[in-house]
Regions:
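Glycine-rich flexible loops
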Residues: 1-146
């Protein structure tokens, strides 16, 4: 996963507030996602770490990017635990997903993203912390594989 450091693109007049708040900084952040030569409509990387911030993730819909963000944070916690446990007991290392596993799970995630979305919407509605005055949009439809 690429790491982006805003310090590398600041100019002399930029405030050092860590905010991506102008087109030049936005272009620099967008460029770090890379160009996917096999799928030109998708970035090479869906998630980028930002020094001093956390991460940025992109997707084709609010549902998809929410899913990516949730599971990126969740999986990072699991990976940190695995690395700490491995270091504590002198294990053989953490086995990461292979290139084929990453590709195949990305394809699977493209259609499974809507499964947790409905549950998250209901949780937010029940929490009372959010009032949607626009109404509930229709549920997204999965593309048919006919």
């Amino acid at each position: 996963m690429p790491n982006w450091d805003i310090e590398t693109v600041y100019n002399a007049s930029d405030p050092r507030d860590m905010l991506v708040n102008n087109p030049r900084l936005g272009d620099a952040l967008a460029a770090i996602f890379g160009i996917n030569t096999t799928q030109p409509t998708s970035p090479l990387h869906r998630t980028v770490l930002q020094r001093g911030h956390g991460f940025v993730t992109v997707g084709t819909s609010v549902e998809q990017v929410t899913d990516f963000a949730y599971y990126t944070a969740s999986n990072a916690r699991v990976q940190i635990s695995a690395l700490l446990l491995n270091g504590a007991v002198g294990g053989e290392g953490v086995k990461y997903l292979s290139a084929q596993e990453r590709k195949d799970t990305a394809n699977m995630n493209a259609w499974i993203v809507f499964k947790p979305w409905a549950q998250w919407v209901k949780e937010v509605e029940r929490s009372g912390m959010f009032v949607n005055e626009l109404g509930t949009p229709p549920a997204p439809q999965r593309e048919s594989s006919d």
